[in-house]
């Protein structure tokens, strides 16, 4: 993990699978609340790296907001685990509708 600008931290998750591009995790650490942009895939390895980043920055998940840029699983995969720890997640309503429409297409 490195601080790329004051209070903005970046961790890159690389994969051995050449078909998977690296994932960048960003956290903006604030005094009262912190902001994470996207999460990553829902894998144990990604969770360990992401949780390690949060812990290293001394962030309480109850004071963490997550902004989801779009509905792909490599951006949303770890949201449920973070919500279980008290984090709040936000996503553009258009992306939320896409996710619901996608779910409905699978159920139709």
Protein language model regions, located:
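Active-site HxH/HxHxD metal-binding segment of metal-dependent hydrolases
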Residues: 55-108
């Amino acid at each position: 993990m490195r601080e790329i600008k004051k209070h903005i931290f970046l961790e890159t998750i690389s994969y051995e699978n050449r078909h998977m591009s690296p994932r960048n995790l960003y956290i903006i650490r604030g005094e009262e609340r912190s902001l994470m942009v996207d999460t990553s895939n829902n894998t144990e390895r990604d969770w360990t790296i992401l949780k390690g980043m949060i812990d290293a920055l001394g962030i309480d998940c109850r004071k963490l907001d997550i902004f989801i840029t779009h509905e792909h699983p490599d951006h949303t995969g770890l949201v449920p685990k973070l919500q279980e720890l008290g984090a709040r997640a936000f996503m553009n309503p258009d992306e939320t509708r896409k996710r619901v429409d996608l779910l409905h297409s699978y159920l139709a």
